[in-house]
Amino acid sequence: MTQSTAQILDGKATAAAIKAELTTRVSVLAAKGIVPGLGTILVGSDPGSTWYVGGKHKDCAEVGIQSIRRDLPEDISQEDLLEVVRELNDNPECTGYIVQLPLPKHIDQDVILEAMDPDKDADGLHPMNLGRLVANVNGEMKSPLPCTPKGCVELLRRHNIELKGKRVLVVGRGVTIGRPIGLLLTRKEVNATVILAHTGTVDLPAELKQADVVIAAAGVPHMIKAEDLKPGAVVLDVGVSRVDDGNGKAVVTGDVDPAAADVAAWLSPNPGGVGPMTRAMLLANVVESAERQAGIA
């Protein structure tokens, strides 16, 4: 068996370092009488969503952020849910919040998300904030950034991986990752050249062979094959799928073939790569919002 050549982009260790930095920043805010607060709106009792929300509040406790939970019944009306959104918009203790998705089918997700205060949008996916990202190519961003794209860029930066002038292939065009990450990567402070591939891309292997960096976010298990990668590429495995392990148990798997570790120079594990960074960036958005409100950001 040959030894893997890829170095690991360790999201767990990097996220832990970021949380330590955030703890210090929260202490500075506390000295001014300000305690950042993360709000969550959870509709129903889906086990996966409940687990995700619980993890976010556990992260809050680690860094000193106040938890504000709004756990609501599955059959809540859209108007009653909007009332909870308005309540968090007006709550001074809540500096940022999320609506856990997906929502039940009887609720219009777009209506709910657009009702959020953009300045309290901890996920960074409000249309206003995405629009600000489109419009601001070079200046300082003073609005929340999408957590997973921000986490990807930060993971690369903290491993001293240069992106300037590099050819970055993003696979997947979802609103959460694929579409906004191109906006971050093409800001002048990063200056990458971005190609966005998707299910309509005619020859994905040809694109992969030219890419210095691959960000796989399609949600298709092991679609990125080792033989298609450029030797020495940097590969971030962001996609999440659940597949049967052969024993009737669902296990989490990514978009990248494990054999990519024999070709890539750097590889993010999945799980344990971008996921912890996404959670850390959620906390960072909440703290940054509190800092802006305090006039120290």
From Swiss-Prot:
Signal peptide: none annotated. Its EC number is 1.5.1.5, 3.5.4.9. It comes from the Bacteria. GO terms for molecular function: methenyltetrahydrofolate cyclohydrolase activity; methylenetetrahydrofolate dehydrogenase (NADP+) activity. InterPro entries: Aminoacid_DH-like_N_sf (IPR046346), NAD(P)-bd_dom_sf (IPR036291), THF_DH/CycHdrlase (IPR000672), THF_DH/CycHdrlase_cat_dom (IPR020630), THF_DH/CycHdrlase_NAD-bd_dom (IPR020631). Pathway: One-carbon metabolism; tetrahydrofolate interconversion. GO terms for biological process: L-histidine biosynthetic process; methionine biosynthetic process; purine nucleotide biosynthetic process; tetrahydrofolate interconversion. Keywords: Amino-acid biosynthesis, Histidine biosynthesis, Hydrolase, Methionine biosynthesis, Multifunctional enzyme, NADP, One-carbon metabolism, Oxidoreductase, Purine biosynthesis. GO terms for cellular component: cytosol. NADP(+) binds at residues 172-174, 199, 240. It catalyses: (6R)-5,10-methylene-5,6,7,8-tetrahydrofolate + NADP(+) = (6R)-5,10-methenyltetrahydrofolate + NADPH; (6R)-5,10-methenyltetrahydrofolate + H2O = (6R)-10-formyltetrahydrofolate + H(+). Homodimer. Belongs to the tetrahydrofolate dehydrogenase/cyclohydrolase family. Catalyzes the oxidation of 5,10-methylenetetrahydrofolate to 5,10-methenyltetrahydrofolate and then the hydrolysis of 5,10-methenyltetrahydrofolate to 10-formyltetrahydrofolate. PANTHER family: C-1-TETRAHYDROFOLATE SYNTHASE, CYTOPLASMIC, C-1-TETRAHYDROFOLATE SYNTHASE, CYTOPLASMIC-RELATED. HAMAP family: THF_DHG_CYH (MF_01576). This is Bifunctional protein FolD 2. It comes from Paenarthrobacter aurescens (strain TC1).
